[in-house]
Structure formats: C-alpha cells, structure tokens
Amino acid sequence: MQLFHLCLVISCSCPTVQASKLCLGWLWGMDIDPYKEFGATVELLSFLPSDFFPSVRDLLDTVSALYREALKSPEHCSPHHTALRQAILCWGELMTLATWVGNNLEDPASRDLVVNYVNTNMGLKIRQLWWFHISCLTFGRETVLEYLVSFGVWIRTPPAYRPPNAPILSTLPETTVVRRRGRSPRRRTPSPRRRRSQSPRRRRSQSRESQC
C-alpha cells in the first residue's frame, strides 16, 4: 500500500501521502474496468489461471515483433493499439519507480517486498492486459471474447462432465470457418443425378439433416 501511495504522489498532482490517500479513495469509489469498452470484464479474464499468460518479456517481444511500427506511429491505428501504448508506458514507469524504491531502501526485506509485490500483483495485471489486446489484434476481438466465454464455461464445469482439454484460442477461427464451409455446399447445391436416383425415404432424411 505504501508503494501505491508513492506512485500516486509521483504520478499525479497530490503533493503529500495524505492527499494521495484521498486520491486513492476517489479511485476506489469508481468502477473502472479496462476491458469493458472492449466487451470483456476483469472477472472474465480472471477465469484464466495466472500461469496461462506469457511472461512480460515474451509479451514485449511479441509486441515488438508484430506491432512495433504501428505503436511508434503518431497516427491512431485502433483502440487496442492505444491501450497497448498506455500499458507499456505504465509498466516502464512502474519499473523505474520500483528500481528507485529498491535502491533507496536499506532494509533487504523491504526491497524484496517491493520487488515481489510489483512482479506478483502489478505484473499479472499487465500480463493480462497485454495478452488481451495482443490477442484481439491477432485473432480478432469477437474470437477472443468467444474464447473467454468458452474457457469460463469449461473451467466451471465439473471435470466429469467436460472435455479433458481446455479450449485453445488459436483453433477457434479455423474450426468455425471449416464448419461453415463444410456444411453449406451440401445444403445449397445437391447433385441432380443423386436427387433422381434417391428413394423418397432418403430424400426426406436428407431434408431433415439440412435443417440442423
């Protein structure tokens, strides 16, 4: 908590720790969810276990490899690019602050406490945020939301009644496309030769299948 007060003192216009507490109380009174404008929620992300998300270094490498030029561009690309910019800058400032606090704390136990708090609590939130926006840019927002809902249903289902493996994000678009393309040609363009040679019972059976 003291570290968070220090963050507020440095980053906002509150000149004292007492003022930062007032600022903190105001922030706590607001229902701020960074995922709501994108159709998700913090609770929806919380279904994914902490070890699901890649490390900060891996996520930064992914961002740099895929979206470096877009993030450096002065033009607005998408809300996801903007959110990534802000989250990356926030993490950089937090690392600078944690380093400064660690270097100025004489007690080794206090230094370890600061480092562990940042890595465990703030690090997880940053990893969740980066993963969400990177995935939305890579797979599409609707696919990511569908995955979060599917995983939430899977994880809440008792093991005896669910598939052994959790849903995989990268397979959702491919599976959906294959299903849509695989069924529609049979319904729309049946073979004329087949239609003439089939018995009435077979035709009725096919008609029922096409409605599924």
UniProtKB/Swiss-Prot annotation:
It is found in: Secreted; Host nucleus. Phosphorylated. Cleaved by host furin. Residues 165-212 are annotated as: Disordered. The keyword DNA repair does not apply. Sequence repeats lie at residues 184-190, 191-198, 199-206. GO terms for cellular component: extracellular region; host cell; host cell cytoplasm; host cell nucleus; T=4 icosahedral viral capsid. Residues 25-27 are annotated as: HBEAG. This is External core antigen. It comes from Hepatitis B virus genotype B1 subtype adw (isolate Japan/pJDW233/1988) (HBV-B). The lineage of its organism: Viruses, Riboviria, Pararnavirae, Artverviricota, Revtraviricetes.
